[in-house]
Amino acid sequence: MASFPELSERAQQLLKALVERYIGEGQPVGSRVLARDAGLSPATIRNVMADLEELGLITSPHTSAGRLPTVSGYRLFVDSLLTVKPLHQAIVDQLWLDLESRENPRDLLETASKLLSELTHMACIISMPRRETLVFQHIEFLPLSDNRVLAILVTSDQEIHNKIIHTPHKFSAAELQTAANFFNAVCGGKDMVSAREHLRAELAKERDRLSEQLLQAGEIAEQALAEGGRSRKPFLVRGETNLMDFVELADVDRLRGLFEAFRQKESIVGLLDRCLESPGVKIIIGEESGFRPLEPCSLVTASYSVDNRVMGVLGVIGPTRMKYERVIPLVDVTAKLVGAALNQRTLAPT
């Protein structure tokens, strides 16, 4: 963030008033309006606004004599001038009731994204739990007909991954149970990537003393681990159509670019990964995203964690003139509640 040590208290207060009025009304703010609100002369206001414009904190659109904040102006406002109040406890309690009642992690995240988009009237984006952070819990095998085995893999988010695997010969239920016991002992408590690598190394090391059936079952387990560690759709987006309600985003070409951005997984995933790098709420404003379709937008995110391990990130996408004082606590609290609800499931007895 740029530093503005030379900014007087009066200039800061006028910038704050200008940003708040622009966020509320969506129209460039004139000096007469600010003068009336601040009880100062229009000439004094114009002088201060000239200084703010010279510093790149506000700008004047061609069609108006009023001013509106730049990305730098929003950044100074969000980082230094904004007062964020806690959410009403009734909202927090209702969010928890809605999230805690979900039966599985996917439903929980779906519900969180829906609630957040409804509460903010903007688009909500949630990255799914990162597969490499998930922990292997256990694996089971069931013999099927025609030399097929059903591998059932359970991970720490309580997701169940099923894969039918064709085998070179028919396994008995007892052989498969022995194999499952061995693999659970070898892989238990390890993340998905480490579990697969450790299993492969253990099978290679013990190859001479393990039965051919167990070695073949090891190949089945490796396939199941690979399937369980493979990413599904990396994120959820809900409430995209809410963005059509904002005048500055309602241009057809701009909306097309935004909706296309939601389909370009690589760019969005890269942006969400950036948001995972620091704890707490992270705010990306306009061109700070480095992603052209999102330049007219701000992204407010917070990571959610399970057992002190960051699993993903959730956030709100809306116009740069969003009501940050409301969006920030909603995102922050929702992320904490999602983590708490997921943690409750992870720690629950199976």
Swiss-Prot record:
Disulphides: none
GO molecular function (one): DNA binding
Domain of life assignment: Bacteria
Pfam families with a match to the protein in the record: HrcA, HrcA_DNA-bdg
Function field: Negative regulator of class I heat shock genes (grpE-dnaK-dnaJ and groELS operons). Prevents heat-shock induction of these operons.
Family according to the record: Belongs to the HrcA family.
Name of the protein in its database record: Heat-inducible transcription repressor HrcA
Organism: Methylococcus capsulatus (strain ATCC 33009 / NCIMB 11132 / Bath)
